[in-house]
């Protein structure tokens, strides 16, 4: 079984805190960390979004002060503050979710995307290497590696196969630095041709698969996990996962039965 614990433009420091939070209730054998975050700015509007969905704990409180901007902290420390003039439109569901949290996700953290963006060319993503930022991110990658070692978890830093990628030079730097930390690094763009991806139907935008591409990559990734001696967990909630399979299958069948919809996504999503 697996779960997606990722948000938009998730930085490496936030990934560290997300991992600690996840491991407070879960015992993963392996974690995959998307390495593009090594080049993200230390702050963007997505930092608040990513922190908002974390349960209350030190793993949310610490990055609220170290990663969020000063004007975002009040809304993160006191979430109802963020409602401002919307108080009279709040429902019991709003309060209960804030207090009790959310129900189990029927897609285990995955976002089902059925629209497609036809891709014409594969390009380098225009990252600018900022040494101070990269160095800080590398320190957090080292903290992730150390935490995983304590918990007997295999960490795998990887690049998702897509059509807007870090340059060969930056990819080589990632490989060298992750190997220096003694952790696995996989560039799945190297397996791009093996995935039998259709550039006209399998991407939502230049950076993300839709469900068609995700199915192909997931099958490839599942077969590769066997290389690490991993086997499916026998401790999972079988009924919950069967329901998730039924839910995903229903969405897939509905999308497969109709024409391919265009996503209208921009050429270079931010």
Regions found by a protein language model. Name each.
Residues 9-13, 133-135, 161-170:
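Acidic-and-aromatic substrate-binding clefts and catalytic sites of carbohydrate-active enzymes
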Residues 5-8, 34-36, 158-162, 188-191, ...:
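Active-site-proximal beta-strand/loop segments in catalytic clefts of secreted hydrolases
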Residues 20, 24, 146-150, 222, ...:
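Sec-exported extracytoplasmic/periplasmic mature domains
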Residues 1-67:
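Membrane-embedded segments
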Residues 27-30, 149-156, 181-184:
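Loop/turn elements at helix/coil->beta-strand transitions in domains of secreted/extracellular proteins
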């Amino acid at each position: 079984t697996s779960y997606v614990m990722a948000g938009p433009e998730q930085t490496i420091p936030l990934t560290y805190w997300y991992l600690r939070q996840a491991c407070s209730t879960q015992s993963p054998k392996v974690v995959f960390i998307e390495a593009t975050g090594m080049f993200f700015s230390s702050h963007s509007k997505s930092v608040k979004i990513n922190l908002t969905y974390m349960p209350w704990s030190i793993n949310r409180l610490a990055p609220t002060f170290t990663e969020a901007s000063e004007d975002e902290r009040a809304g993160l420390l006191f979430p109802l503050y963020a409602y401002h003039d919307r108080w009279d439109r709040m429902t019991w569901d709003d309060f209960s979710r804030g207090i009790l949290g959310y129900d189990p996700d029927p897609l285990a953290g995955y976002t089902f995307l059925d629209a497609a963006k036809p891709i014409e060319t594969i390009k380098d993503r225009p990252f600018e290497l900022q040494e101070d930022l990269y160095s800080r991110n590398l320190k957090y990658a080292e903290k992730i590696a150390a935490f995983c070692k304590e918990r007997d978890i295999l960490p795998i830093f990887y690049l998702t196969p897509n059509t807007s990628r870090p340059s060969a030079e930056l990819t080589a730097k990632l490989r060298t630095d992750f190997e220096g930390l003694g952790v696995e690094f996989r560039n799945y763009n190297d397996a791009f041709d093996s995935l039998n991806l259709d550039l006209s139907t399998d991407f939502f935008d230049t950076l993300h698969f839709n469900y068609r591409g995700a199915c192909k990559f997931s099958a490839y990734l599942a077969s590769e996990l066997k290389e690490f001696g991993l086997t499916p967990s026998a401790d999972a909630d079988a009924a919950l996962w069967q329901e998730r399979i039924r839910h995903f299958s229903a969405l897939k069948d509905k999308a497969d039965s109709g024409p391919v919809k265009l996503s209208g996504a921009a050429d270079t999503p931010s």
